[in-house]
């Protein structure tokens, strides 16, 4: 059985499949990306074989920032009697993500990417597939009864899959975060992010020392470097001026094969960011005469 992913996936959507390849002998294959580092329907079609059982992709990648055509990809894998699994960590907080419209079989996303607490996440699955899932751990709360004769009766979904004491405080915090985002409106959040992204790219492109690795990003994610400067040093420099960016490989260690660089600085725009903050970033990047004084 084959599982299709890409080299732009987060570790959370790579390592579990690689472990299953070792344990039970599945075959992990990579869908090639095009010259813009994006997934195309043509490349998906060419990657599917009679042995393909799963396509597992991020809806929005956390480095390239592209929005995948999940609805069309889902149609292709279902025609092959396979499953569509989606990493929604970068889509659910930022844009409308419709599991029914896109015919997604499983969708996973986390609270801390959408103003919620850490240690909490969501797994959506079609009920017919959840019914067949084996719990990954066992304990109190998941069973209706168990007897000395070793008979066990488990509860119905979702309790059957949730043993022990849940992260109650985390779940309640996540609920409030969702309510807050819904009050603002996911469409309004997405519109705001795209406006900021376009504004940011226009400004960054005017700085000759800046190299942008995803100029065609379709989300609020922009990755860049100051030429000939380590990403971590750029991050330290910006931090001196109270500007926070992420520096490193962003848990996508294979994407270097696509963009040609191991570490980058990543800007992840969200509902709380402003054009004034972008202006401050641009000002610091343009007037970087003190860069070496700060990082050395």
Positions of the model-derived regions?
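Pyridoxal 5′-phosphate
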Residues: 1-296
